[in-house]
Amino acid sequence: MDKAVAGVPRWDLSSIFSSFDGNDYKDALIEYTSGMDSLDKRLKDEKGQMNDFCQWLADYLAASNKVGALEESLNAYAYTAYSTDTTNTDYLNNLSKLEEMSLQSKAQGLVFQDILTRNSQDLSTFYTSFPQFAQYKYVLEQIIEDGRHRMSQAEEQLADDLCRTGGAAWSRLHEQVISNLMDSATGKTFNEIRNEAYSPDASVRRKAWETEISLLKSMEIPVAAALNNIKGATVALNRRRGWNHALSRALSSANMGEKTLAALIGAIEDSLPFWRKYLQLKGRLLAGAGSTCSVAGSGAASPSGELGTDSNAVGETGCHFYDMFAPLPQPYSRAGSSCGAKAGSSGVSETHDSSVKMDGWTFEEARNYITEKFYGFSKDMGDFARTAFENNWIDAEVRKGKVGGAYCIDFPSKGVSRVLSNFTGSFSDVTTLAHELGHAYHHHCIAGLDYGLIHYPMTLAETASIFAENIIMKDVIGRCEGFDKLQLMELHLQDSCQVLVDILSRFYFERSVFEEREKGELSASDFCRLMAQAQEKSYGNGLSSQRHEYMWAVKTHYYSPDLDFYNFPYAFGLLFALGLHAQYQQQGASFAEKYQSLLKDTGSFSCEEVCRRAGFDIETKEFWAAGIASFNSELEALLDYEKSLAKA
């Protein structure tokens, strides 16, 4: 392992369960199965439902909350083990076993839905008689509404059963294929290769990009088959369930209306000239500093492997795809520093005297810095971060067989979370850690609620994570001067461009995939064509003519049979988080309590209602445009920097 990332931890799961063979895990399985059997009996108790439905419902919800929390925790434990070693057949078999056991839970959900619908006229009395369940009003109404898009119980149970060897199996195949890709020439894993996109060395970025494309192309047939079959199954099931389009189902799952989505997408589309201007500027800055392989005479390797100038560099002003994550090139060698971005060993209120590092971070530095900044927002958030780090909640080591990217997963029965990342020492890795810990903090805020009230939609799930990222970015940018400040502003624009422009391309891609999949089978060449079109429509002349046509093979969200359009929630989260951060800057420390209350509400109301409670009208394009406008000053600063270079 590189010296810069020595000491990167693996997580400790022992406080959750000792092992799959441990008595605590076996006892939990027994408790889970007996709890499921008890719920079956309650669902069959027609006499109790008829005599006193309100009492029956109160008892059922209490019992269901306990069983549901345990079920999710068992599944989370199985997935955390599997995701760090996808080659382990025991882990895979255990995950499959739990998925099979979960079928009983899904079947119970269908029966409960029917019972609730038949007795919906009693719900007003229920909320009055049992005020402790008054906050369930929106949740129960959504269950009834979802029942309008459902097949028969027998058909739904069959669909769930078939998914284990259908959609879920195709999804695992994708994970296994991608997580085990390796460059035979260097021995580097796929995750290590993708992380080289952040290298300051242009030749490293270019070579990594070519290797990534080559590896993905070598596995295009099985990966395309996985995506084709997952989306095909979704199309068939949506048709049977009465959904007009997968997007309608996604909006329902997101507790969000079409008017809100139209306003969000419209605002992003209106901002595309701004983001293309940024990307063109980045391309010019890299070319001017000789920090790209795509300028004449650079001796760069072309896609064919020959040395020379990239053929599509001639006459183009856009940034090259493999340069999008390149650090801003330094105009000269600096001594000393202009701001501090590393925390001291205590992690709190240290004097900073080191420059901002775009790479070379140790995990300890990241830990101390994040903890300190979270304390700057509130003691509760700081205490939470300290607990997560001190108790090894994070698996950050890059290794073969481990899934790429990053995620946060919750264990409701234990009231804790775990975070997976692939830490290589870049500043982007630091913000990724903050992002995932933001998710975990969200769970921390709702941990005391009933299990039935903690299921927030995808849109609001991204708000807490991006808010946590903003705490880091705003702090660093605010304390920096000179080139350090410019470097961080560019990184902020880079990340936000991904959340808005790249997310828009993913939205376009998935929408077109569903439209074409309804007409017939799709192959790897079809997916490449649709991805190139989506990137052209979103990035346009912000990029050179190069496109990453295999991006569909990289993003795991496309391969979830139950989760379509997991793209616009990121844009929602970013812009909503910017609005919240603006309130924080206005209100100061008193905002922390309001923020906690907002996070607690996310599983109890629609997106529109949660946002109204926070003082926002998200059904207007103006709201989203205001968030995007906050980036104007950063781009202007970079344009001024370019002018200063021209004068030098």
Q: Where are each of the predicted segments found?
A:
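A well-structured
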Residues: M1-G299, P303-V348, Y641-K647
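C-terminal, non-catalytic "cap/extension" segments appended to globular domains
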Residues: A4-G7, S14, F20, F112, ...
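Glycine- and acidic
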Residues: P200-E212, R249-A262, F321-R334, S349-M358, ...
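A glycine-rich phosphate-binding loop feature that marks nucleotide/adenosyl-phosphate handling sites
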Residues: A236, K282-S294, V314-P329, S346-T351, ...
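Active-site recognition of the HExxH zinc-binding catalytic motif
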Residues: G242, G425-H443, S465
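Auxiliary, metal-adjacent structural segments of Zn-dependent hydrolase domains
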Residues: L286-G297, S311, G315, R334, ...
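Conserved helix-loop functional segments at active or binding sites
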Residues: E372, G376-D383, I409, H439-D450, ...
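Post-HExxH zinc-binding segment in Zn-dependent metallohydrolases
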Residues: P457-D484, H492-L493, Q498, G573
